[in-house]
């Protein structure tokens, strides 16, 4: 970090946590950019509990989350020093836990989980295209199975006749309902994914690819599922893999099943209800006093909102985000010619 930010105002504070482990934590921040209230709130939260030991930062993360019941992560993690340095310049705090290969970034936001470190290495047109693609992939990963069930069970009138007949022909001979069919295949792919993670090396990747192909083809040949369901599950899985942060993607993997049952038993009304409840939950989340949906809520400037969905050119990113100290809000200006 010192190689990337040679600034005397970048401070490193050490603290110990864990009665028996005495795990060393390091808090990194830039003194004139971070809000002192935010910094103090983070310190207070870290010192709130007395525990035998903190062995890895995942324990620290789950112990100090404000909304511990929420599936959405409230700490952002990174293994890349360049990403951590970028967030320090935005006025955030980076927490490094002893014996852990990645750092925690505070506060976190919905938009931050959808950003990739590679965005800053691409030209802004390509980076903006990739961000839009990620948001579309997110909607696909969460809503596609539920929308399919809602349409095929309750709203067939919105489909063209030829497409509806094609769906009916594909499902001919399948003994299960469309809900059971989709849940069976989704859980099968979850098993394959988990097996691929547990098996080491390239063999795990081979299990994921070959296992998916074999199970999908065998299920279609045995008339257990229809081909369209295999395609929907595959698109859903691909959409989830596009999300840069794995913890964030895992939250939506769980949410996918909620929308699946809402769409399967309540139709489009269930999908709309699920979207409303999810948006309400996300709107109520705070990360150390910062709204989780920043910059899409509150009094964010329109440029902040634009830089959330798109990646603005560097020369247009002149103002720091709202959570940085506003006395140092300007981060880019032209030099005056002498």
Stretches with model-predicted labels:
Residues 2-181, 288-316, 323-337:
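Cytosolic regulatory modules rich in charged/polar residues
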Residues 4-8, 45-52, 87, 91, ...:
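Conserved, well-folded catalytic cores of nucleic-acid-processing
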Residues 137-156, 171-246, 251-252, 257-263, ...:
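Transmembrane alpha-helix detector for multi-pass membrane proteins
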Residues 227-229, 233-338:
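Hydrophobic alpha-helical transmembrane segments of membrane transport and translocation systems
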């Amino acid at each position: 970090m010192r190689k990337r930010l040679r600034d005397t105002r970048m401070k490193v504070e050490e603290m110990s946590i864990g009665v028996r482990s005495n795990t060393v934590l390091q808090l990194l921040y830039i003194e004139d950019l971070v809000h002192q209230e935010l910094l103090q709130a983070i310190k207070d939260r870290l010192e709130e509990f007395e525990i035998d030991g903190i062995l890895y930062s995942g324990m620290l993360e789950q112990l100090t989350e404000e909304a511990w019941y929420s599936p959405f992560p409230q700490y952002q993690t990174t293994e890349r020093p360049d990403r951590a340095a970028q967030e320090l310049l935005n006025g955030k705090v980076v927490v490094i836990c002893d014996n852990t290969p990645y750092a925690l970034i505070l506060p976190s936001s919905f938009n931050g989980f959808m950003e990739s470190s590679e965005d800053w290495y691409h030209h802004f047109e390509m980076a903006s295209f990739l961000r839009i693609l990620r948001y579309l992939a997110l909607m696909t990963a969460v809503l596609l199975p539920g929308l399919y069930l809602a349409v095929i069970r309750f709203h067939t009138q919105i489909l063209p006749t030829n497409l509806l007949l094609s769906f009916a022909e594909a499902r001919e001979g399948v003994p299960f309902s469309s809900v059971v069919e989709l849940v069976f295949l989704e859980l099968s792919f979850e098993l394959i994914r988990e097996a691929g993670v547990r098996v080491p090396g390239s063999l795990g990747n081979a299990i994921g690819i070959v296992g998916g192909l074999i199970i999908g083809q065998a299920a279609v040949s045995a008339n257990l599922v229809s081909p369209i369901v295999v395609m929907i599950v595959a698109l859903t899985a691909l959409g989830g893999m596009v999300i840069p942060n794995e913890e964030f993607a895992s939250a939506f993997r769980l949410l996918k099943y909620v929308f699946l049952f809402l769409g399967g038993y309540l139709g489009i009304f269930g999908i709309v209800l699920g979207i409303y409840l999810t948006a309400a939950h996300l709107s109520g989340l705070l990360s150390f006093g910062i709204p989780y949906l920043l910059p899409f809520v509150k009094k964010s400037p329109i440029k902040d909102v634009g830089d959330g969905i798109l990646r603005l050119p560097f020369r247009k990113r002149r103002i720091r985000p709202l959570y940085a100290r506003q006395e140092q809000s300007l981060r880019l200006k032209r030099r005056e010619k002498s």
